[in-house]
UniProtKB/Swiss-Prot annotation:
This is Nucleotide-binding protein BL0705. Keywords: ATP-binding, GTP-binding, Nucleotide-binding. The keyword GTP-binding applies. Coiled coil: none annotated. The lineage of its organism: Bacteria, Bacillati, Actinomycetota, Actinomycetes, Bifidobacteriales. Residues 1-35 are annotated as: Disordered. ATP binds at residues 46-53. Residues 13-29 have a biased composition (Low complexity). GO terms for molecular function: ATP binding; GTP binding. It comes from the Bacteria. GTP binds at residues 101-104. Signal peptide: none annotated. InterPro entries: P-loop_NTPase, RapZ-like, RapZ-like_N, RapZ_C.
Amino acid sequence: MNQQTTNRDTGEAAATNAPANSATSTSTPDNQPTPLDAFEVLLITGMSGAGRSHAADCVEDMGWYVVDNLPPKLLIPLVDMMTTSGSGSESGVHKLAAVIDVRSSYFDELAAVLGHLDDLGVKTRILFLDASNEVLIKRYESVRRPHPLQHGNRLIDGILEERHLLEDLKERADWVIDTSSLSIHQLSTKLYEAMLGSGPTTVAVHIFSFGFKYGMPIDADFVADVRFLPNPFWVPSLRELTGRDKPVADYVLSSKGAKEFLDAYEKAIEIALEGYAQEDKHYVTIAVGCTGGQHRSVAMSEELARRLRAHGLNVTVSAREQHKRHSS
């Protein structure tokens, strides 16, 4: 079966036509409730084995709050809680994604729940993952697991029963993505293109400084050793400062080899980030180490972050040893 993506306007039209007086939650002013017409619900559903779990991971990366295997009847209470309690506003989460399949309790109540959400003015959309019967059979055979609706019968029987149960939901879906010929990376790109209009083009970068004397980091994609630079610890006027203080930063960055190292490392990171974006890796951690994690590594981390931000990258910085002092 050929790859296919379908975009429909059913969900958006229903939200637009909702009564104006039902589009705002009630709450105390201190709770800062989220207006219902500013809240979004996404249902992730489709054929078992078509990629729902991976789709949920991608949607979570897009900023949605994801709940797996949620009974449809709990959607309304959950939306009400996230809007009227103010928790959505405080956390910045205004988008709820629920993974629902035919095994969810009270699946037959879904149509009524969707109608209720439409009446409330909540923008509700459906992402449906599909694949051909032949591909689904191959996928199940490769993992040697039974289909959830197989019930001791043939695998194809379970697939056909599920396809029949999901017919109406597929017709209502805003996006139908056929994953028959898609790899995991291609599915990710397809989801970004369908839901955001473009694929993931940047990688979020976190840089942290550390001290080798306190142990090597275990969660870094890159580790830079800057102990080749002169150590400000041995300069009495700089010892009690950190790499975030200008005198220390000036001392470190003006040292022989600092600029050349940063130039080369910046270029290497740029090349790697371009490749990571193509390989569907959206988060990269860079560790920069010196002896105690107070001076050289901090100054170099801050400067590397400044350079990468100049390229439009989303970069955060932290100091692992910030609570340790008097360390070289």
